[in-house]
Amino acid sequence: MAKYESSVQQVNAPVERVYAVLSNLEKLRPMLEVAQNNEMLKEKIREAGQDPAMLEKLKDVTLTADRISFPAPMVGEVALTIIEREQDRCVKFETEKSPIEANLWIQELPVTDLTSKMRITLKADLNPMIKMMVGSKLEKGIDDFAKMLSQIPYNFI
């Protein structure tokens, strides 16, 4: 199993709020709905040299309390299901309907009463050829994912 870890990210919310949101994926629904039509977000995406039409893909994301699924090019639907929760510390996911067997952990730790930090770890069953082709992309993707999760306004969800 190949292992990829993000850098540690600071979060401007207490660990209890972060855990409450990430351990119940249904709580992300309002944020996804708002993001689809957010002009300020579209402008930021343009500034980053990306196509804001990518936000349209958010309508294809399916959420339940324990599962998130989304279409993936050339693969079909990919899903992550929560398989373990450790109160205010960790949420562990497992891939479903994915060509690659993988587990993903989101670890949260308190820093102060009002802030916390997080790190994401991905363990994926990759053959050597695939690892060579996508390893660096997974490393960057996990780090970008952690940065994105650290920016969620947990105190307002």
What are these regions (language model features)?
Residues 1-62:
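Hydrophobic ligand-binding cavity/cleft-lining segments
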Residues 41-96, 155-156:
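Glycine-rich portal/gate segments that line the openings of hydrophobic small-molecule binding cavities
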Residues 18-22, 28, 82, 120, ...:
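Hydrophobic pocket/interface hotspot
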Residues 2-8, 67, 77, 90, ...:
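Intrinsic-disorder/low-complexity, polar/charged segments enriched in Ser/Thr/Lys/Arg/Asp/Glu/Gln
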Residues 26, 138, 142-157:
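Short amphipathic alpha-helical signal-transduction/dimerization elements
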Residues 12-15, 83-88, 107-117:
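A short, structured loop/turn motif at beta-sheet edges
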